[in-house]
């Protein structure tokens, strides 16, 4: 039976000017991931990257640690949703990151404050009631990721394994598909 490993990128640079890059911790995580996969003698017949910088950096560290020199194929179907647009649609003032930062700092616990805002923004996006406010609706995002998995599965031979470097949202969409869950 073929296998698809969905690998979430290492820690991104939350709070920096460019979120779409790994932090120092994220780079270390990518190497540890590769070492773990190598130790388990994980097969890697097909390598896929979602196309974001954090995906590529995770793949580079992981594959180097595994002793693999091949470059992953880029597949935009495994890209993450646009979390910045999702937050801006929820509250247009969040287009200015300083406004978002000020909002979450008011909570006293910035991580929990951000999580609360993010959950509300994600619920709004997933509701389907405001699809015109987004470049990609939740349903379109799920359809895109499902297409990526379906196409990838069709390419794999009977005992082949694919490593897919992606993000948590895409992985969640695959879980949603496999479990037959509703949009909410």
What spans do the regions from the language model cover?
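Short, positively charged
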Residues: 1-2, 116
């Amino acid at each position: 039976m073929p296998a698809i490993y969905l690998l979430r990128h290492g820690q991104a640079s939350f709070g920096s000017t460019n979120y779409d890059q790994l932090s120092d911790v994220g780079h270390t995580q990518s190497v540890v991931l590769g070492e773990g996969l190598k130790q388990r003698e994980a097969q890697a017949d097909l390598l896929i990257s979602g196309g974001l910088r954090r995906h590529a950096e995770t793949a580079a560290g992981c594959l180097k640690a595994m002793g693999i020199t091949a470059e992953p194929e880029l597949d935009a179907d495994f890209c993450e949703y646009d979390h910045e647009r999702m937050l801006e649609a929820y509250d247009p003032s969040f287009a200015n990151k300083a406004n978002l930062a000020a909002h979450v700092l008011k909570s006293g616990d910035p991580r929990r404050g951000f999580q609360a805002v993010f959950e509300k923004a994600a619920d709004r996006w997933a509701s389907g009631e405001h699809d015109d406010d987004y470049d990609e609706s939740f349903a379109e995002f799920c359809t895109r990721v499902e297409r990526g998995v379906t196409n990838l599965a069709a390419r794999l031979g009977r005992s082949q394994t694919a490593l897919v470097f992606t993000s948590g949202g895409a992985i969640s969409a695959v879980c949603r598909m496999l479990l037959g869950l509703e949009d909410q």
